[in-house]
Each structure stands twice: as C-alpha cells, then as structure tokens.
C-alpha cells in the first residue's frame, strides 16, 4: 500500500462553472440569483449559511419541499442553547416524507435485502408502502397511541424500516436495538422508555453462527410487564410463537390506507442511545422536524443523493448512521440492505461490503473508516475483483481515516469517486464535518464543516486556537437536530452536563479538532481520551495513524493512566498480532516506529498482547470504558455493568482477559 503525506490533494474542487452539476451547486446558484449573494468556493457558501442561519434553514425547507400541514411562524424563534426553538407553528411528520419518496418510485425496487439468515428479496416502492400500512393497522389494533414508545429488536431488513415509518407516521416514538445485544444491554436502554410494544425476531445468523433470541424476548417480557410483543420469524419461518405473543403474519394481516398524524416540529420521533460509557446509556430524543430538515440537507445537499442513486449503508440498527440511512428514502433513492458478517467467509468474499457494492450496482457507499483501513492493510484490491465503476461517493466515519488508506481508496476502488471522511455523532444524528461536492479531497483530512454548522476549535479559555493546534470541537450556534431532551432527565441537568458544562451556551462535543493551513480539519481523538504525558497532550489518533499500517499488527489500543503527582504516568499499548507474526520482532518494530514517526514521549511503557481490543460493531475503539473498568477494578470498586456495555462489543468474551492483562503490568 502506498504511503501518503498528510494533506496530499487527491481530488481538486470543481471549477465554479461546474457547480450546476450538483444539487448543492444549483441550490447556491439560486441563492445568488434571489438574494444577491456571491460564492466562489464552498467556504463562501458555508460562511453564508452560518452567518444567515434562518435564511439558510428556511431555504433548505423550501428547496426540499417539506410537507407542512400548518406553516411555521419563523425559522428560529430562540437561539438559546440548549432550548433553541426551530420552526414554531409548523405541523409536519418525518414518516410522511419517506412514504412520498417510496410512492414516487412506484414499481422500482427500493429495499433490496441481502441476508445470511434467509433468502434475498426486494420490495418496490408500492410494496414497501403497503407493508407500512399493514403495520399501522397492527399498531392501531394493539392500542398504540401518539407518544407511545415502540421498540424494534430487529436487524437491518425491510420490516424494520417499514416499522420505523409506520410507528412515527402515527405520532408514536420509535426505538431500535440491534439483535446482537443481549438481554441486559437491551433492558438498560428500553426500560427507561416504558415501551408499550416490541417487535422482535426469533434469531439470526452471523456468518456460520446461528444465534437465538427467543429467551431474550421472554426475559424482556418478564422485565416489562404489560408490553405487547410481536414475533417476526426470521431465522425459522416456522418458529413457534410463545403464548401471549402475536405472530408477525397476524400483526400485518390487514391492509389499509396510509395514515399520518401531523405533529409540531419539536415532537419526539426516535430515541437513540449513547454508548453507555458513564452509567446507563443516555436515551437521546430526536424530533420529527430536526431530523427531517437536517437529513434533507445531508442527503440532498451534502451527499448529492437523488432518485437515480442506489445506496449501501453498512450499519447495525443500533447506530445513528442507520437512522440517517433510512431517511434516504425521502430522496427517492433505493437502499441495499445487508444483514450479516461482512468478513465471512473472507474479507474479500461474497458477503464483503465490496461484493455488496459490485453485485448490486451501488452508486453511494457509507461505511466505517475501520473497514476501509482493514481492507487496505489486508492488501485487498476490490476494484479488480468487482466492477465498482458506478460508485461515485464513499462516506466513512466512526474513526479518523488515515492518509494512506485514502490513497488506497483511489488506487484500488475507483479513481473517479468522491471520498468523504466525516465526523458527527448520535447526539445530533448527523455530522459536523464531511466532504462536499463543491470541495476537494485531501488525504487524511476532513474537508469542510457541514452547511449551517458554526464549527470552531476552542482553547480552554473559549477562544479560537491557532491554525495547526488542537482545540475542543465546539458548535457556537444551534442546529435543528440537537436533541430535544434525554428521556427521564426531567430537569435537563444531564443534558446540560453532557454538552454545555465547559462553555455555557456553547456545544462542546468532546473531540480534539485541528484546523489546518489548507482549510481542512483533523480530529485527533476524544478530548476525554487524550493522553497527557508530563503536560504534553497526545491524541489517540496519532498512535493509530502510524500503527494501523504495520504489517504484522492486526489491531491496537492505547491507554494512559495518569500520575496524580503530574508525572509521565503509565502508557499501555494493547496489541493484537496477526497470525504467524513474531511478537518479539513486532514489539521492536512498534517501538521504533513510534519513536521515529511520533516521538520518544509516545513510546509505550508496556505492550500487552491480547486476542482482541474492545471495539463496537461499527469499529469504534472503546478506550475510555476500558480504562474506567481497569481503574475501578484496581481501586476495588463495584463496577456497574453499564460502564462497559458488552452487548455492543464484537468480542465480548475477550474483555475479562484484556482487563486482567492490563492490571498485571501496571505498578
């Protein structure tokens, strides 16, 4: 794999004369004509969007043809954070816009389902709407009312998407928990909500593994008395339906007309959950209007998706990316849905994400940066094995994308595509930073703040840090998709403490952000996971940037245990060796690489060999939870299981051994 300098230009920004080729370009050409503004670059357009926040979001509403059952009084009635008031007076419904998108495509395949558990199939736009109406009839018979919470304990399949649309169109609140989560992880989330109904599957396959969820459903019903349960026979079409549970076929037996309940802009739509690193997962409530206008901006303007696209978002149903992916249907684009292990039977096998793209004529691909890095470091050449010429854009997130991996994408996937490393969060169910059709692509960097995002990098004193220095990622003006509230946080104190405790009235996200001299951006790690060695701050991304490419190293994680007296502390590197690698030789290579490419200060005090490191299914390293568990264990404290939610981990059985190995080396 070719090495690459940070910031190397991989694709230039389009000429001003080419702006009309994208939805974003045409949007700003209209703004120029109607408002007398002038834009030469994306930076100009972004600056206008944050300087004229009400105008911008009002124009997004107009451009994307939001269906309003009552008009809004003004765009932004209060700019206070938290508590900004967006589009007061408007009556809308998120689900109605997805149904409009589905109906507009009629007989075109819109939900193209690929599964390791059952046979493949597709639903046309009309068929998907029919399923939505059948689910609505079942919900109504079950007594689900506006404001009730409905849970989907389901994978990324058409039924889950139809359930999401049906529930929210009726004004009820949806919550998704992925089937890889066990009973405790599910209950830690949904018990907070007191849901009235759950739709669950009987089981599923993950590669060669067959996993039952029958006992989990029974335990959930026992823990939440009175909940209505629906069983979807997924692993076994003839699965026995327990007493007191309704079969999916009976639940969806009656067809009906599509029903929509218009609701105020700030009405709860969906509950997403934090990763649970500081107690039970935060139940983050997002509203109909916030996700509607934000996802319209994302999908149409930032990602340039329209009815000609066939999109593939690889995501578990527990990740915010899945919620964003479902909104794709608003654009008339179709979705390729995959449920299964993308590394089975091999990283470049028939179930790989690359195979999903090539075999299904995908044009837009959203995945984890970790997946791209793993493919690159494994020497995979997807562009040679599959026809990926139709892939016009790759969006990647979850962790920083290294410069050499970005170069690999252009060399081995498609030289003409647009690569868009992005960063956002469950907290806003969208992004702060991304690529854009009007911007270029630089290796190892994120191109631009998203439109309408007043992004900055701040010092502890609350001022913009100099170019090239890390600061706290802040958002200085409100966004429509900031959470309405946290469920159960009646006084709002937990919400305020999560984002507004450092800079009152200013959103602090918790990432270290660097603004480069190229006007691009780098996230160097979580600010609460930063390593402070003798007063020098080190971002974890700096380590992974030099370690991930090492030939014999399969994975790694860096932990720093501070010295209360202000000394250097203990720096521990968890390392996973590839099969056949010489651990002693690899340890020397690791230390030499870190010493020469970073600095002697970065060299770990201990290298601990482990079978895996704690990662979520989306590839996110869980440094902070692991560090807390180690600290609590050493101090003899009782550890709440929610400190590290094993239900979200790829290798939960390895965790106890990893914890013990770290404790063993610490003095």
Question: PLM features: residue spans?
Answer:
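AMP-binding adenylation
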Residues: 1-19, 208-209, 222-223, 240-244, ...
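AMP-dependent adenylate-forming
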Residues: 31-38, 97-124, 235-243
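Conserved AMP-binding/adenylate-forming core of the ANL superfamily
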Residues: 43-48, 95, 111-165, 182-187, ...
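Structural core segment of the AMP-binding/adenylate-forming
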Residues: 165, 169-250, 360, 368-369
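Conserved AMP-binding/adenylation subdomain of ANL enzymes
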Residues: 292-310, 320-363, 378
